[in-house]
Amino acid sequence: LLAELLAKQMSLRAHLAEFLGTAIIAATVIGSGMMAQQLSDDILLQLLVNTIATVFILALVIWLLAPISGAYFNPAVLVVALSRKMISLRVFFSFTIVQCAGAVAGAVLANGIFERALIGPSTNVRDGGWLIVSEILATAGLVATIFIAINQGRSENVFG
């Protein structure tokens, strides 16, 4: 069973699923943030728009792609999967590479859609002591969401 799972994870199809899922999530998070900024100056409304878009796209890509690759979509999720011996070191490194490429592709896509420079630094200054706390919480939320969905078999019935 473990050999079968490893073979499935090492397939081209699994790698494409990780690339595509990560790209879609990145494009949605970045693009919905850009769209929200265009819609309103109200920061609370911007965060709400971004959060709603992120939640729905995350549910969708987990539902669609978990059966193909495991729906890891983030190196932090892979670290947890590796520590739980759900994936091999080889899968960890190969998925990390395709996820990074997918994240870049998603960012480029979002920038292109909103007619911004395809590659460049963020125009939003993000600093302050609470930034690292918010990143840790967001990453922990992503890890929990993916593993709860996968471990409880919800990747197949996220929408009911």
Q: Where in this protein do the model-derived segments appear?
A:
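Membrane-interface helix-loop junctions and terminal tails of multi-pass membrane proteins
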Residues: 1-160
